[in-house]
Amino acid sequence: MALRAERNACQKSAEDVLGRAQILMKKSIRLTVGQALVRFVAKQYVERDGRQNRFIEGFWGIFGHGNVSGLGQGIVECAQEEGLRFYRPQNEQGMVHISAAFAKHRNRLSTFACTTSIGPGALNMVTGAGVATVNRLPVLLLPSDYFANRVPDPVLQQIEHPNERDVSANDAFRPVSRFFDRVSRPEQLLASLPEAFRILTDPAETGAVTVSLPEDVQAEAFDWPTEFFEKRVWHVRRPLPERELIKEVVSRLQKAECPIIITGGGTIYSEAWPELKAFTEEFGIAVTETQAGKGALNWNHSLNAGPIGSNGGTAANELATEADLVLALGTRLTDFTTASRSQFQNPTIRFVGVNVAPMDASKCAA
């Protein structure tokens, strides 16, 4: 028995050695985390309806304590080589708003990454993160964080919490981000960054994505597998509704006496305005607009009733008061759209939500 146990131990040891050898034999490149991050984001592309483009157009950032020698150096050394531009704003909150606005303009198929220093520089991005997440707009946030090894402790602008030593200013990003990760080792990015981009490029999950980067980790060198930097194309999906649900919607439309359409930002992001125009003209259903949905149907179209809700117009709001069926296309049905659910007065009203996000599609008991 002892001999067999010794033989098994030797076999296990040999397997471990072979496993490590296979890892070492893989092609690798030695880069700092800052350099690797720039090269990785440059290779991330999206594709929808056969059209393909780079997802991260460049970086916005204000350099200071925490990101100068890490991501800052990586941007200086690698961004131009990779075809990424760098822009310096006057305020961190502003650069997140700019990135979200750019993503909106590009129908969520492109955005920017934003880098900041530790503490107040990072906290200035929190409001922008909340706006991006609420409005389903992709932005990649890379705030700097205190030293992962905690040898320099405390450091400038560190929150010295008396009971929770792992808390930093960047924890404020957790409730306003669709994805949050604080990395403490370079190799953790091998799993974290692909997941971050999966969420950024998913129309149902997108919003602010935050990867918190300790300043020592940013400057740490690591042997990265070269396959990590190969071009990756993320397919932007167009999920199809179930046939039974379509039949139910058709049945409701046939029975409705005063249906209206509320078109939101999703109609624009999905480039569905030709289908909206064809549908409303075919069936003669009036279209009302949310703030994000403005422009989905030409302003001078005979069936465009204009903005709806608390800050809406008379025509749209009078139609909403009498409507017995609301077809909500790509809208979050916010309080401004529904006037805090007081806009619709017909006791028999029903809602149909058409949205890639189940949470938004099911609002107002749709």
Predicted regions, residues:
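Basic polycationic patches enriched in arginine
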Residues: 4-7, 20
